[in-house]
Amino acid sequence: MNNFLLKPLFEKKADPLTLLLRDIFKDNKYAMSYLGALSIGLGFSHTNTLNAEEADSSVEEIIVTASKRATNIQDLPMAVQAISAEELEAKNITDFDDIAALSPSITLDSSGTGNSYFYIRGVSDGGFGNRAGAQASTAYYIDEQPVSTIGGNPDPHIYDINRVEILKGPQGTLYGSSSQSGTVRIITNKPDPSGFEAGFDIERGDIHDGSTDESLETFVNIPLGTNTALRISAYDISNGGWIDNVPSTVSFYYTGATIDNSSYVEDDYNWIDKSGHRIRLGHDMDSGTTIDLSFLSHESFSNGSWETDVVEGARKNSRFADETFDDEFTQTSLTINGNLSDDIEFTFNTSIFDREIDYTYDYTNYVYTNYYDSYSAYAYDYDYYASTDARMFYVENDQYDRQSTEFRMQSTNDSGFRWILGVFIEDQELAYSTTYNMPAISNILTSVPGRWWKQDNVREDSQKAIFGEATWPLSDKTDLTVGMRAYKNEADFDAKDGYMGYYQDHPILSWAAGRTEKYSKDFSDVSPKINIAHKLNDDVLLYATYSEGFRPSGTNRLNRQARESGIVPATYDSDTLTNFEAGFKSTLADGKIVLNGNLHTMNWDDFQSTSYIYDLLTVAFVQNVGQATISGLELESYFNISDSFSASLMLALTDPEFKEDIYDLQGQLSTPKGNQLAYVPTEQFVMSMNKDFVIRNRDAYISYDHSYTGESYQSSANTDTNASYSLANLRFGVNPSSKGSSDADDIVGFLQNASLEVYLENVHDSDPTLGIYDDFGDVRRTGSKPRTIGLRLRYRF
C-alpha cells in the first residue's frame, strides 16, 4: 500500500468552504482526499435512502468528557475516538496493545509489557525509552490523573472500564505537558447506588507453538443506602510464553574464553503473571455534590524477554542471564464534583500515583561489542582482570512518585456563552538505580563483589499551570472557542555514578572516574488554542482548530569526558508542536451512518531526541535537534447496515518529514532533509464487522477485526525498514439460554445471564516487527503474539 492515496471523490464546482480549505492545506497531499470525503458527507446529509422499518438501528451515541464537560462525541468539534464499554467487552480489550490495535492514529513501539511507547499522529522522536530520556509525547490518563512515565508507560489491565477516549492532536490547553501529540484517557466505572450488579469472566487460550493463557476477572457494585455505593473489581491473569531461549555460546576476544547459556535454556520462557484490584466508593450528597474515592493496585511479574534475536530465527533468542520485569503501581484518587451556584459547577481532584519497577537484563553482547567503542582496549584485557567469564547483566530499580491536583470551575450551560477555568499543580519524582554486574570480575579492583558500574539518579519535575477556555456564539450555528494555558516547569537532576563500587575516582584505575552532579532547568510559557465550529445542519458539524502541545525542558547527566568536550548539552529546551486542523462530523441516514474526518498539518520545532555518543558519553542524553512537519488525514466511518449487521472502517494517512538537515554533535550529517520520522507508518487502517443472528432459538454473533500497518523506518537515517503487516481476530459467541424461554427450559437456569465465546486472535499467525533495538551489536526485535485460540465464559448477575 505504498503511496496509497484516496482519489478526489467529487467533480462538482467547489463551494466557498472547499475553496478555503484547499488554500489552507494546499501543501498537504491528502487534502483532495479529505475534501472528497467531506463532499460525500454533505451529500448524504440531504438524503435518506434507508427503509423506514430499519430506522431504529442507529449507531451508538457515546458521551465523552474530552473537553472537561460531558458532550455527545458527535457534537464535539475536535478529533476524538471513543471505545465504549460494550466494545471493550465485545473485543476483549485487556491492555494498551489491544487499544492501539483499534486506533489507526496510534503507533506502538513495544519491547514487552511495561516497556511500550506510543505516539499519536506520528509524533515520534525516535527515542528508545531510556530513563534519562525525554518526556513522552503522548499523555496517558487514568480518570483525572496523568500517569505517563519516562522510559515506558504503565499498562493497567482493562476491565470494568466505562470507555477509552483517544484525543488526537495537541491538547496543551486543557491537558498540559506531554499531551503534545494527543491524550489517551482510561475512564473507569463509577459506583452506582441505584442497584446491585456483579459478574465474572473466565478465559483460557492456547498459544500456537507456545504455552497457555488463563484469566479470572470479577466485579461487584454494592449499594450502601440510597446515595452511596461501593464498586470493586479484581483480576488474576497468567499469560503463557511463546519465545524459546535456545542454546548458544560466546567467545571473548582477549582471553579466548568461551561460555554457554545452558543454565538458562528454556522453551516458552516469556510468561507473565498479573493481578490487581480497584476499589471505588461514591457518595451523592443531598446538595448535589458527589464525592468519589478510588484506589487502584496492579502488579505484574514477567519472566524472559519479548525481544528475539534475528540470527536465532523466529521467536527465539539466546540469553546468558535471567531476565525479569516486576512492575507494581498504585493510584489513590479523590474527586469532588458540585455546584458553586445554579450557573457554576466545579471539579476538584487530587491523586497520588506510585510505581516501582525491578528489572534485570542480559548485557553480555554489550560487553562483547559496544565496550570496545566506549573505552580503551586495556579496559577489556580480561587477563588483567583475572576474569575468564566476562558476561554482564544489569539490575535496575525505578521508583516513580507522581502527585497531581486540579481544581476547575465551569459554566453549567451547554449553549450560549460558556467557559472553563482551572489550576493544575503536579510534582513527580523518578529515582532510579542501575547496577552493571560482571560476576567474574576481579575482587582486587572492586569494593563491591561482581560490580562493574553503578548509577543512582533522582529526577524531579514539577509543573504549575492556569488554564481556561471560553466559547462565544457568533450566530445560531457558529461558535468561537479561545483557550490558553500558562505554565511553569522546573526540572532537577541529582546524579552519581562510579566504577566497581567507587562514586569518585577509582583509587587504582585512572580512567574509571566517578562523579556526583546536580543540574536544574526552569521554563515557562503559554500554550494557546483557537477553534471555530459551524453546525451546517442538525447532522453535520464543521470545525477548524489551531492548537499547541509541548514537552517540558530538562537536564542531562554528563560524565567527565562529555563535560570536557563541551559539545554535549547539560540541559535541553522545551519543544512545541503546532497544529492546524480542519474537520467534520456527520451523522447520516437517520443515524445509521457516522462519517467523521479531519485534515491536519503539524509543525514540530526544535524537537527533543534521545541519543548516544559512545566515545564521549556512555549514557543517553537529550538534545533539541531540528524541525519536522507531519501532515495527515484521518477518517472514521461507522455503518449500521441493518438491525443485525454493523461495520466500521478507520483510516490514518501520515506524511512525517524532516524539514531540515540534522547533524549530530560531532558535526556529521545524521538525518537528511526529507527523511521520515522513525517508527511512523504512512498508512494505517482498522476494519471491523459484526453480525448478530439466532441459532436454535439462541442469540449468537460473529465478529471480525482486521488492521493494517504500513511500512516504517527503524531510525531517522531511513536505512532499515519495518515491513508492513496485517493482524486479524475472529470471534464467535452464543448465549446458552434459549431466546424467549423460561428458566425451566434451560439446562441450568443461571445460564440466562451467561455468554460463551470462542475466539481466534492473530488469525494468520503473523509475526510483524512491533519494536526494534540494535544497541548490542546484534538486532533485537519484538514481534507479535502467535495465533491463539481460546474460550471465554462471561456471566452477569
Task: Please place each PLM-identified region on the residue numbering.
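Conserved C-terminal beta-signal and adjacent last beta-strands/turns
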Residues: Y30-A31, N221, Y400-M409, D414, ...
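N-terminal periplasmic accessory domains that precede
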Residues: F96, Y117-Y119, Y141, P154, ...
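Short acidic/polar hinge/loop motifs at secondary-structure boundaries
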Residues: R131, S137-T138, D143-P170, T218
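Transmembrane beta-barrel wall of Gram-negative outer-membrane proteins
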Residues: H208-N303, E328-T332, D401-T405, M409-E426, ...
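Membrane-embedded beta-barrel scaffold of Gram-negative outer-membrane proteins
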Residues: E217, T335-Y363, K535, L541-R551, ...
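Structural signature of Gram-negative outer-membrane beta-barrels, strongest in the C-terminal barrel
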Residues: L281-S287, M409-T412, F424-E426, N457-M602
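Outer membrane beta-barrel strand-and-loop segments of large Gram-negative receptors
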Residues: Y375-Y378, Y384-S411, S447, R459, ...
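Gram-negative outer-membrane beta-barrel transporters
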Residues: I420, D476-L480, N596, T601-N603, ...
